[in-house]
UniProtKB/Swiss-Prot annotation:
Source taxon at top rank: Bacteria
EC number: 6.3.5.3, 3.5.1.2
Organism (species): Symbiobacterium thermophilum (strain DSM 24528 / JCM 14929 / IAM 14863 / T)
Sequence ranges assigned to domain Glutamine amidotransferase type-1 in this UniProt record: 4-234
Cellular component per GO, a single term: cytoplasm
Name by which UniProt lists this protein: Phosphoribosylformylglycinamidine synthase subunit PurQ
């Protein structure tokens, strides 16, 4: 079982991602440079957060054109698991592997702090270890986390159960006040139609041990391992 962690110029969350994969959920993990063209050694790929290429043009707009993203598209087409976190989510939308896109936060400020998200679909490779409706405490850290899509796309996401998480209160209520960035319908994470490519705006890799304030983030990585191996990781 081996995970590839993509690294672009400006990626800054690869070390936390490496730690949770190796030390918390116990799988092999490698850093994969943005010039790589072959992902066949890997069972899953994670695109971590950061500010790739300094967010020039817009978040993810340059990274999506890196050579490794052609390999990611081929990997996903073969059914490989791909998880994009924060900037990784933005890159996946820019690459056309997930629908929609991102705007600057509606309040015009960078947002860094704890958020709560409600599990909307617990039957995906990224949420198997979660309960439907479970509230997770996971931090956000972004200036362009405002997910938007046209009405038809938003309708399809809901009808096809492609929404993984919505921002919510600690009690699980989806309210405007619980939305840290103005995302349409409080969307915090989605999955593609085939269920193997996911993007989340909060940072699960920053919430994997109680000493950090929450261990809820490890559920996403544990879910991926469970899907790939059948091994259930206690969290």
């Amino acid at each position: 079982m081996r995970f590839g962690i993509l690294v672009f110029p400006g990626t800054n969350c690869e070390m936390e991602t490496f730690y949770v994969l190796r030390e918390v959920v116990g799988v092999q993990a490698d850093y994969v440079w943005h010039e790589a063209r072959d992902l066949t050694p890997y069972d899953a790929v994670v695109i971590p957060g950061g500010f790739t290429y300094g967010d020039r043009v817009r978040s993810g707009a340059l990274a999506c054109r890196a050579p490794v993203m052609e390999a990611v598209a081929e990997f996903a087409a073969r059914g490989g698991l791909v998880l994009g976190i924060c900037n990784g989510f933005q890159i996946l939308t820019e690459a056309g592997l997930l629908p929609g896109g991102f705007r600057p936060n509606a309040h015009g400020r960078y947002r860094c702090g704890w958020s709560r998200v409600r599990v909307e679909n617990a039957a995906t490779p990224f949420t198997l270890a979660c309960r439907p409706g479970q509230v997770l405490k996971i931090p956000v850290s972004h200036g362009m986390g405002n997910y938007q899509a046209d009405p038809d796309t938003l309708r399809a996401l809901s009808e096809n159960q492609q929404v993984l998480f919505r921002y919510c209160t600690p009690e699980g209520a989806v309210t405007p006040g619980a939305n840290p960035n103005g995302s349409a319908e409080n969307i915090a994470g989605i999955v593609n139609r085939t269920g193997n490519v996911a993007g989340v705006m909060p940072h699960p890799e920053r919430a994997t041990e109680q000493v950090l304030g929450s261990a809820d983030g490890r559920l996403l990585f544990a879910s991926m391992v469970q899907h790939l191996t059948g091994r259930v990781i206690r969290v």
